[in-house]
């Protein structure tokens, strides 16, 4: 065989091909903890150089973009709430890597990374934060309400996305689509009643939904241990099978979702997946994040479990990429984010007229009551208004 056991990087053993060492490699994930499953995802994870570079670029872009978002908030350019994804990048990037055309995702308010991965350039995300007309939703959504193709947001209410994701999965089954809906929430939202109502319906009708708990350890300022009688969130579904995955390992996350998709596509119904991750910042920008945990705890995670540093060490050690290649990637990311920050400062703000757009999905026929000219104005879409204002 041309496969041999390479060095251990963090908790992962590198298995490399002697013949293809520079273009592909295999790593081992931490064991997946299972609930009501006879077997789970394979711990052996294969990755090509092309994919490795893409995942690194995406994670690093999200990290730098969120740093820029935090700085814009401190400059008082961002109004309202602002929840950053720093530390959790491997979750979104790994999940997106496993998704196929037609698959959907829906999350809560920590949505900047998902918006970027769903097709919005960094500039669109940052311009949305500063209320610019060039933002993801023309400056009207702000930090918590951003969207993309098959990405349903961005929801500002804790747990509100859980029944919505279940509904998206219901539509997929009704239309006989071979797709899944990834429904994301944090550990703090696992105690919300709508999660259990949703899981009951999903299991009753065997819906293709993956309930994913991004367990970053804290719901606002409350640790998981103080808020939950059981912190094994992957077992919360009771009659819904589930498993635990290391959410700081982008390849393990990808492996988990690929396996989950196969489960759903086989008609077996929902799964509950817990991704163990960590957020470096506070719950939001108004939370310093150090009153309920120590700075030493944060630094320890950065030092031993950081998703970007850990992945970088793996792929460099395996010979997939060089330090110089990654430095070039970092350089390009800096340029992109710096240019986006300038746009977020200087692009036109959304005008007051935009408040009247997107009130309804489409324009009703004239014979409908109350469709006077002033009411019809409310049926204009943001896109139509943007085009008119750009003339």
From Swiss-Prot:
Pyruvate binds at residues 83, 109-110, 148, 156, 158, 187-189, 216, 218. Residues 1-17 form a transit peptide. GO terms for cellular component: mitochondrial matrix. It catalyses: N(6)-[(R)-lipoyl]-L-lysyl-[protein] + pyruvate + H(+) = N(6)-[(R)-S(8)-acetyldihydrolipoyl]-L-lysyl-[protein] + CO2. The keyword Mitochondrion applies. Pfam families: E1_dh. It is an enzyme of class 1 (oxidoreductase). It is found in: Mitochondrion matrix. Pyruvate dehydrogenase activity is inhibited by phosphorylation of PDHA2; it is reactivated by dephosphorylation. One of its GO terms (molecular function) is metal ion binding. Keywords: Carbohydrate metabolism, Glucose metabolism, Magnesium, Metal-binding, Mitochondrion, Oxidoreductase, Phosphoprotein, Pyruvate, Thiamine pyrophosphate, Transit peptide, Tricarboxylic acid cycle. CDD domains: TPP_E1_PDC_ADC_BCADC. The modification Phosphoserine is found at residues 284, 291. GO terms for biological process: glucose metabolic process; pyruvate decarboxylation to acetyl-CoA; tricarboxylic acid cycle. Its cofactor is thiamine diphosphate; Mg(2+). Mg(2+) binds at residues 187, 216, 218. Its EC number is 1.2.4.1. Its main location: mitochondrion. InterPro entries: DH_E1, PDH_E1_Alpha_Subunit, Pyrv_DH_E1_asu_subgrp-y, THDP-binding. Thiamine diphosphate binds at residues 109-110, 156, 158, 187-189, 216, 283. NCBIfam families: PDH_E1_alph_y. Heterotetramer of two PDHA2 and two PDHB subunits. The heterotetramer interacts with DLAT, and is part of the multimeric pyruvate dehydrogenase complex that contains multiple copies of pyruvate dehydrogenase (E1), dihydrolipoamide acetyltransferase (DLAT, E2) and lipoamide dehydrogenase (DLD, E3). The pyruvate dehydrogenase complex catalyzes the overall conversion of pyruvate to acetyl-CoA and CO(2), and thereby links the glycolytic pathway to the tricarboxylic cycle. This is Pyruvate dehydrogenase E1 component subunit alpha type II, mitochondrial. It comes from Ascaris suum (Pig roundworm). The lineage of its organism: Eukaryota, Metazoa, Ecdysozoa, Nematoda, Chromadorea.
């Amino acid at each position: 065989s041309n496969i041999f056991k390479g060095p251990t990087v963090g908790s992962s053993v590198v298995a490399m091909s002697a013949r293809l060492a520079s273009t592909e490699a295999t790593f081992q994930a931490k064991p997946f903890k299972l609930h009501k499953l006879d077997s789970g995802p394979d711990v052996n994870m294969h990755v090509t150089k092309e994919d490795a570079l893409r995942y690194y670029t995406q994670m690093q872009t999200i990290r730098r973009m969120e740093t820029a978002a935090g700085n814009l908030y401190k400059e008082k350019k961002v109004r309202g709430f602002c929840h950053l994804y720093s530390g959790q990048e491997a979750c979104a990037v790994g999940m997106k890597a496993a998704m196929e055309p037609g698959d959907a995702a829906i999350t809560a308010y920590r949505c900047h990374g998902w918006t970027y991965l769903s097709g919005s350039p960094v500039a669109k995300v940052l311009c949305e934060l500063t209320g610019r007309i060039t933002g993801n939703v023309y400056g009207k959504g702000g930090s918590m309400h951003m969207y993309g193709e098959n990405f349903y947001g961005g929801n500002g209410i804790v747990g509100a996305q859980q029944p919505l994701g279940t509904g998206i999965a219901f539509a997929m089954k009704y239309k006989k689509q071979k797709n899944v809906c990834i429904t994301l929430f944090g550990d703090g939202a696992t105690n919300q009643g709508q999660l259990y109502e949703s899981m009951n319906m999903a299991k009753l009708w065997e819906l293709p939904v993956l309930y994913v708990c991004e367990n970053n350890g804290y719901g606002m300022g409350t640790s998981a241990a103080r808020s939950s009688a059981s912190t094994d969130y992957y077992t919360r579904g009771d009659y819904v099978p589930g498993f635990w995955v290391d959410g700081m390992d982008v390849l393990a996350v990808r492996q988990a979702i690929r396996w989950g998709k196969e489960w759903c596509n086989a008609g077996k119904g929902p799964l509950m997946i817990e991704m163990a991750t960590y957020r470096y910042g506070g719950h939001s920008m108004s939370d310093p994040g150090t009153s309920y945990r120590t700075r030493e705890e944060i630094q320890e995670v950065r030092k031993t479990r950081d998703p970007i540093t850990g992945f970088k060490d793996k792929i460099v050690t395996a010979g997939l990429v060089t330090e110089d290649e990654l430095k070039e990637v970092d350089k390009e990311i800096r340029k992109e984010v710096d240019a986006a920050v300038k746009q977020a400062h200087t692009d036109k703000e959304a005008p007051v007229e935009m408040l009247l757009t997107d009130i309804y999905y489409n324009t009703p026929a004239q014979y409908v009551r109350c469709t006077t000219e002033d009411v019809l104005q409310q049926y204009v879409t943001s896109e139509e208004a943007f085009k008119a204002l750009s003339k």
